[in-house]
Amino acid sequence: SVFMTDQGISMTKYSLLWTLNGVLIVIIQLIITWINRYRSNLYLQVFLGLFTVGFSFVLLLFAKSYIWFVLAMTVLTIGEATAFPTMPAIVNELSPVNIKGKYQGILNAFSSLGKAIGPLFGGILIELSSYRILFVVCAVAVFVTLAIVFIVVKANQSRTVHY
């Protein structure tokens, strides 16, 4: 919100972005559920979702007017609603029955860790540099994560056991 208000955008418009986020999550989840009835590829969903999240940070590099923030939030929400709900499904598919809970717990622990450390890291990065650097670091981090996930999935695809 500070970045947007520094650009002269009102808090009301900022709040509307979160309303847009919520509405889009519901709509996108309905669409994904419908698509998955006919064709489901969980890994493709994660790949596309992560790419889209990374791209949203690239868009923020150009955000000078409200429409850019709307576009970045829309792209972020598409990625968020595509990738993140899929990860527990993949963990469930790859985990033996007797230890599914353990692996779901590990996934949730790392998710919580990111939510705890992310704002602190972001705040420090903004204080030491700028929002622009933060957006570049976030985009690079997401794209590097995407590349690692893609390489690991492809390297282990032939010997992966689905439960």
Go through each PLM region and give its residues:
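Loop-to-transmembrane helix entry/capping segments in MFS-fold secondary transporters
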Residues: M11-T12, V97-L107
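Structural signature of the two symmetry-related core transmembrane helices
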Residues: L44-L59, A139
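Multi-pass alpha-helical transporter architecture, strongest
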Residues: V137-Y163
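Helix-loop junctions at membrane interfaces in 12-TM secondary transporters
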Residues: L61-M73
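Short amphipathic helix-loop junctions that connect adjacent transmembrane helices
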Residues: S1-L17
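A membrane-interface helix-boundary motif in multi-pass transporters
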Residues: I124-V142
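Intracellular juxtamembrane helix-capping segments at the cytosolic ends
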Residues: T82-S95
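Helix-to-loop junctions at the C-terminal end of transmembrane segments
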Residues: I28-N41, I126
